[in-house]
Amino acid sequence: MAKAKFERVKPHVNIGTIGHVDHGKTTLTAAITTVLAKKGLAQQKRYDEIDNAPEERERGITINTAHVEYETEKRHYAHVDCPGHADYVKNMITGAAQMDGAILVVSAADGPMPQTREHILLARQVGVPYIVVFLNKADMVDDPELMELVEMEVRDLLSTYEFPGDEVPVVAGSALKALECGCGKEDCPWCGKILELMDKVDEYIPTPQRDVDKPFLMPVEDVFTITGRGTVATGRVERGRITIGEEVEIVGLMDAPRKTVVTGLEMFRKVLDEAVAGDNIGALLRGVDRKEIERGQVLAKPGTIKPHRKFFAEVYVLTKEEGGRHTPFFNGYRPQFYFRTTDVTGVIHLPEGVEMVMPGDNVKIHIELITPIAIEEGLRFAIREGGRTVGAGVVTAIEE
């Protein structure tokens, strides 16, 4: 039998479940697949199949993540669920699972808890743009006033971290009851709530802009000269598209971007008219000397990205067991920061009131690089010391 072809008919969206430990994130994930399976839109996944998440490595960090896929009538979803709190922190900071939106699971019986707050803060810091709330364990709350109180608390908490708390959709239900019932009917008091939640996710979380529609950017991996023709920069197109004759800027490792024109494009030794996101290409650049471009710079659509030296970032510091440092670091710590294709040395400034950072911590820091790099909010990087990864980070704000 021939392999099933992936039919790209529905728009694709990446989401995940976030929230405090034991509030029912994994149960909800299992319930979603169970209810949608009844409509022929998903493969049912049991709780233990999701809970025993496989290990993955991202930027030298081991993370346990479960990936589940399912569809609604309108969309195709890739859904991530992590077993442990540390896995969420690592996942969100490394961008191992980029989320276009998240389902925040809060137990109606307990209300918001410390990790509820922490996950909302992380979502804000790393740029998860939309949150939909599922108040779980509603079967354990008899008092409607108590339900209202918990909902208000969650909305206030979201507003505190600059999410639109008043507008965020909130659905109350019981993931466990829906999982146990599994009828998948809309008029079922439990399964119906799961379907209502997915309707809200469909409506409220917008379809993201595709990489190919974003402005062109290609990290330079290698540079060589073709005698008689000029300098070629190679790399994988990260986003956007580029055609022969277009102007681009070389950005990074120098104070001001430098303009040039792409006079030729090649992929796998074949000539191209146009390259798009995901293509591994060589770009022939007009009037650029071999010494004027190097690995660590980027080619970009003019005016879309600038070189910067100072910025704020949310970082996760690896534990000793993860191959990280054995000791804390202090203000003025000078590791290397690995952006896209290269290491750059920089100085870390800790926030006021933070004396030191321990292995296993996540913290917001200020970084000053010794040389400018093409940086924008949301850019992921690794922190390295003598060639080994000791942490991971994401740019949250640019200073200069």
From Swiss-Prot:
GO terms for cellular component: cytosol. Pfam families: GTP_EFTU (PF00009), GTP_EFTU_D2 (PF03144), GTP_EFTU_D3 (PF03143). One of its GO terms (molecular function) is GTPase activity. Its EC number is 3.6.5.3. Residues 81-84 are annotated as: G3. Residues 10-209 form the tr-type G domain. It catalyses: GTP + H2O = GDP + phosphate + H(+). Monomer. PANTHER family: ELONGATION FACTOR TU, MITOCHONDRIAL, ELONGATION FACTOR TU-RELATED. This is Elongation factor Tu 2. It comes from Carboxydothermus hydrogenoformans (strain ATCC BAA-161 / DSM 6008 / Z-2901). The gene is tuf2.
